[in-house]
Amino acid sequence: MKKLLKVTAMTGSLTLVKMLMGFIIAKVVAIYTGPSGMAMLGQIQSVVTSLNGLVNAPTSNGIIKYTAEFSPKGTEACAPWWRAAVHWALVISILAIAITISFSTMLSGWLFDNTEYAWLLILCACSLPLVTLGTLLTSIINGKQQYRQYIKVGMFSTLVTAGVMVYMVIRYGIQGALVAAALQNAIVGIAMLALNFRQPWFNFNNFWGRVERKYLSGLGNYILMAVTTALTVPISFIFVRNEIIANTSWVDAGQWQAVWRISETYLSVLTIALGTYYLPKLATLTSRSEMQMEIINTLKVVIPFAILSAGAVFFFRDLVIKILFTDEFKGARDLFLVQLCGDVVKIISWVIAYPMLSNAKTKLYIFSEIFFSLTLVLFTQYFVRQLGVQGANYAYLT
């Protein structure tokens, strides 16, 4: 528990910067695009999350685990895993780019009710190699538990991407917001390359070369889990927005997206700490009892924090809306209570689900992701038609 608190404190500055930048971006988007623009931005962000999840499948959790596990033996022990990740990432990137470009017109119609944004989806696809590069480097730093370097590069990337987003929104309105959302993770990839190419482990031979089958297959379960998440969770939220739009309006979808954005922002305090400390820590544990103890100790920190944070957001929701958005978003105040209850349940489920990633419990993880996404869509269809936009939050809590 002490280590988790220490890492949480260490990542506090990064978390605060990310929260601040998230608030600034939300305010700028609200002013220059309104609720309907917020909903459109949410749609493209879900696409970006899905595509990024696909290409990052080989370079994220599996690399964190194996880097943490083999780092004590030196870079030479980690390099085969890194090379395997690069091979997988190249194959998945080529497939993702080809499929997205081929179906860009159809996807644009599904997301935005018109085909004018096919070019935006092509832009998302073409940026994917840089995205997976950034994730690979971040995962290596995380796996090595180089927390200071992790915070440094995270801070720089956050400031750069936020600056690009704000400039594009102010200069070009909703079009600029959509382009910035499509490219921000590629910008992170460039920043990660610039900040890490002098690291002693950053050597071409560590990332490219012959790979034994056992390393490729060793990442296989992590790839299956990540691909499942990429193809279920973000796409389920697209279905949720489409259901809200079909039964209410783009404005209501934007109100819902605003509340969701607030949840994402304050929960980032925990997600950064868990991603930085919890997963690498689980990878080093060898016994069932040690893992159970780690889960219990983590929950002792996470549950009170989640409840207190959700309570603070609820009681100050009017002030939050006033600061972060505009008067057009006042209707969002009625959406907070159920959403925040769902957030508490969600963060607890994260703590419980992380051991599945650490131990590559593929079947259980895949089932849980598909089950969550499917029930979210089905409950949303039912509740939104009965209760309007509030129904989406009841579906999330359920």
Task: Cite the ranges covered by each PLM segment.
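Membrane-water interface segments that mark the loop-to-transmembrane alpha-helix transition
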Residues: K6-K18, I44, N56-T105, W119, ...
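Membrane-interface junctions at transmembrane-helix termini in multi-pass inner-membrane proteins
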Residues: P129-V153, C341-S368
